[in-house]
UniProtKB/Swiss-Prot annotation:
Zn(2+) binds at residues 70, 73, 86, 88. The gene is hypA. One of its GO terms (biological process) is protein maturation. The keyword Zinc applies. This is Hydrogenase maturation factor HypA. Ni(2+) binds at residue 2.
Length: 113
């Protein structure tokens, strides 16, 4: 399960950006063509955040659909796999979205001093 290593990296990046502040929420964008399983990330998140500033944080995942642009006609089509056929019959597609993995938002607890 490569999601465990991916989740460890996400926790490390968020921890670095939080600079010691308690993290309340993390929003990820995961492309549907990325071969990353959101449910596995959720499972690993609970394990990887134990004893960190992310412990107890809410994890939200926004799944980004696959979208391709035809090199022949310029048309755009939604993809559920990294290849497809355009309405014009061409298989020459460039992926626009669907392979991403982004930490989109981090919400931290504000400390009043």
């Amino acid at each position: 399960m490569h999601e465990f290593g991916i989740t460890q990296n996400i926790v490390a990046i968020v921890t670095e950006h939080a600079k010691g502040a308690k993290v309340q929420r993390v929003l990820l964008e995961i492309g549907k063509l990325s071969a990353i399983m959101p449910d596995a990330i959720r499972f690993c998140f609970d394990i990887c955040t134990q004893g960190t500033v992310l412990e107890g944080a809410t994890l939200e995942i926004l799944e980004i659909p696959g979208l391709g642009r035809c090199r022949q006609c310029g048309g755009e089509i939604y993809l559920d796999k990294p290849f497809g056929i355009c309405n014009c019959g061409s298989v020459q597609l460039d992926l626009i979205t669907g392979e991403e993995l982004k930490i989109k938002e981090i919400e931290i607890e504000e400390l009043c001093v």
